[in-house]
Amino acid sequence: MRSRLEEQVADLLDELDVDYEYECTKLNYFIEANYIPDFKVRDIYLEAKGFFKPSDRRKMLAVKKLHPELDIRFVFQAPYNKINKNSKTTYAMWAEKHGFPWCAYYAIPLNWLKP
């Protein structure tokens, strides 16, 4: 049991000789949210990132899963920063692993910006 209250409820069910299962079912749920890309250049969405929070990484994976047809690219302030202090993974490595093109803000490829 995960909490004292759950233990108390289980004890009550046991005392009443109620058949039950504990945490036997996993149910998916979704919290509806919106993503507003920073920039749109033609059909390319540019997401400018300084600090790349775990919640932002989860959000971007969710957006990519729901909209695989979109061309979303990262423009990192510091692409070689680690995603956290205990990781060897950099922002750039994370983007590559998940199929997002990326660049540093000071080196945006011109072919991203002009036809």
PLM region descriptions:
Residues 1-115:
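Nucleic-acid endo/exonuclease domains
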